[in-house]
Amino acid sequence: MATVNQLVRKPRAPKVDKTNVPALNACPQKRGVCTRVYTTTPKKPNSALRKVARVRLTNGFEVTSYIGGEGHNLQEHSVILIRGGRVKDLPGVRYHTVRGALDCAGVTSRRQSRSKYGAKRPKS
């Protein structure tokens, strides 16, 4: 335990939390422009062609964002919204594309978990 005199000379340093999504600058989402849309392979033991986009954000950051759902309409110069959330089997991918916002269309014919994929309610 530190003495009062020690604390007067050098106060306790506050704990600093490190963020997992530094490019968001404490915002819930950020807008950006796709600079490259491509597929990449996950790390072992998984195997797939995961759809990702390289995005230049409005604050100048350039990040890699995962495009969830089956099929997408993104290409270079598409304006998209990204949110936090990493993809465990893709190293360096710490952001998700928000489906159904700005230039990114929602997933067509999606019936369940529609809100996560920007899909409208089907006409019963």
UniProtKB/Swiss-Prot annotation:
GO terms for molecular function: rRNA binding; structural constituent of ribosome; tRNA binding. Pfam families: Ribosom_S12_S23. The modification 3-methylthioaspartic acid is found at residue 89. The keyword Ribosomal protein applies. It comes from the Bacteria. Keywords: Methylation, Ribonucleoprotein, Ribosomal protein, RNA-binding, rRNA-binding, tRNA-binding. GO terms for biological process: translation. Gene3D superfamilies: Nucleic acid-binding proteins. GO terms for cellular component: ribosome; small ribosomal subunit. The keyword rRNA-binding applies. Part of the 30S ribosomal subunit. Contacts proteins S8 and S17. May interact with IF1 in the 30S initiation complex. Belongs to the universal ribosomal protein uS12 family. With S4 and S5 plays an important role in translational accuracy. Interacts with and stabilizes bases of the 16S rRNA that are involved in tRNA selection in the A site and with the mRNA backbone. Located at the interface of the 30S and 50S subunits, it traverses the body of the 30S subunit contacting proteins on the other side and probably holding the rRNA structure together. The combined cluster of proteins S8, S12 and S17 appears to hold together the shoulder and platform of the 30S subunit. This is Small ribosomal subunit protein uS12. It comes from Shewanella oneidensis (strain ATCC 700550 / JCM 31522 / CIP 106686 / LMG 19005 / NCIMB 14063 / MR-1). The gene is rpsL.
